Amino acid sequence: MEQKQVPLLETRNLKKYFKVKNGFLHAVDDISLRIDQGHTLGVVGESGCGKSTLGRTILRLIEPSAGEILFQGKDITKCSKKEMRAYRSQMQIIFQDPYSSINPRLSVSEIIAEPIIVSGQYRSRAEIGKKVEQLMDTVGLASRLYNAYPHELDGGRRQRIGVARALALDPKFVVCDEPVSALDVSIQAQILNLLMDLQDALGLTYLFITHDLSVVKHISDEIAVLYLGQCIEKAPSRELFANPMHPYTKALLSAIPVPDLSMRSKKAHIIRGEVTSPIDPKPGCRFAVRCEHACPECTGADPAFRELSPGHWCACPMAEKLAVR
């Protein structure tokens, strides 16, 4: 009997609640995902749905409230700070804003060298300098920028610094937290192509967080759709775009600009109503109050996250009926 491949990273019923004045804000609520080695899982959803919190909780930059985070089969939620230090080099993050996420007082080489020095992997300055030069070359930063400062560079080069810093300790898993959203469109494609080239060359595994559906389609093997802290649909990238099953996913995809105005009117799915409060939400589908297809099964209990076709999961009791329309 063939053994099932152990994913590089897996979350099981992961939760992150923040204490607020009136209760608990459910930022990440019972999310179970898996990412195989060398693959990219895209995470999409509107602002405030919990995308960035999910990524940072997986890295334990934010401590989870409940659930498991398995990295190469080991639950890192049970690791002490000392034990986590060994995993930090294997799990890195590229932040959204390439300027605010780097120290403006440090030069390019000093920024990239910082994690190398902290890790203690290289002892001599010559070894560290050689590693920095290698990383700069890998991400397409000219050697003449070695002693430059962030304010002297454009957004694309600053983000390349962020990529080089994330790669400094040879990680296996990288959270890309909207790494191109703050960049000009002309630069976005360059950074996306760089990330994909690095994945091919180094065997990297990505959790790619974005609100741009055209970007996530370009880079992801699988896509998970989040709404108010919950994963409501997950499928291979092509399958999700060709056959979305959840009404919220359909609405998101209908918002993608198309050049044909007649096609735009045919595919429009307008979401009406107010977003449900994420503070101690009642059981049931959190999209139901805005959904034109809501039924009695949508209230009273959270919809089951079901596999409706191979690899295609959806949390909607109406999914089969909507699929045949």
Question: Where are the language model's segments positioned?
Answer:
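Charged, flexible cofactor/metal-binding loops and thiol motifs
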Residues: 3-6, 24, 237-325
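P-loop NTP-binding/switch modules centered on Walker-like glycine-rich loops
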Residues: 46, 175, 179-183, 187-264
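Helix-to-loop junction immediately C-terminal to a conserved catalytic motif
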Residues: 59
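Conserved ABC transporter NBD signature motif
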Residues: 67-75
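Conserved ABC ATPase "signature" region
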Residues: 75, 126-144, 253-254
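Conserved ABC ATPase signature
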Residues: 149-153, 157
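A short, proline-enriched helix->beta-strand linker immediately N-terminal to the Walker B motif
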Residues: 168-172
